[in-house]
């Protein structure tokens, strides 16, 4: 697993896993077809790292860049207080909205900024419950040592 490699190599982690994530509302390039994806979230210093695995061949922002078995840097994520304003700002600059979703009580969108930086830009709302969750993960990272178990359950117990 990449998470284990990053943990051993850089001290990243622990990682919180979300398997086969489903959104409440989803749109990818004007379709509602949602790919089957799993996520692992963790910190390396002050930087959140997100590993994403797509389990199927549904067209997606991930398959836009990587075929099955390929890996690489996919997006930069930005937490925003005014989601609609930030989305509008990117659209007015001429960037395409590749994907928009609503999950876990928060809006997120992926803007196709590859022409500028080679990757997508994710904008993500910053409600208190999300900031609290990210803060818990960051605190777990601050206590984390290379060689520790690299998985963190949602209730913050190391596994």
Features from the language model and the residues they span:
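Glyoxalase I/VOC metalloenzyme domain signal
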Residues: 1-16, 29-96, 112-159
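Short active-site-proximal "capping" loops at secondary-structure junctions
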Residues: 19-25
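Short Asp/Glu-rich motifs
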Residues: 25-26, 109-110
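Short beta-strand
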Residues: 99-102
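Short acidic/glycine-enriched loop/turn segments that link adjacent beta-strands
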Residues: 104-107
């Amino acid at each position: 697993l990449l998470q284990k490699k990053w943990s051993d190599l850089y001290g990243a982690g622990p990682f919180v896993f979300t398997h086969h994530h489903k959104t409440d509302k989803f749109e990818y390039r004007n379709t509602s077809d949602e790919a089957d994806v799993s996520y692992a979230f963790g910190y390396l210093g002050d930087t959140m790292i997100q590993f994403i695995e797509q389990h199927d061949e549904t067209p997606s922002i991930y398959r836009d860049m990587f075929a099955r078995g390929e890996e690489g840097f996919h997006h930069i994520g930005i937490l925003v207080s005014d989601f609609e304003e930030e989305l509008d700002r990117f659209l007015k600059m001429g960037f395409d909205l590749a994907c928009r979703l609503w999950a876990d009580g928060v809006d997120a969108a992926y803007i196709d900024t590859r022409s500028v930086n080679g990757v997508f830009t994710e904008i993500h709302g910053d409600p208190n419950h999300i900031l609290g969750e990210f803060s818990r993960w960051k605190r777990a990272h601050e206590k984390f040592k290379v060689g520790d178990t690299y998985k963190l359950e949602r209730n913050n117990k190391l596994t």
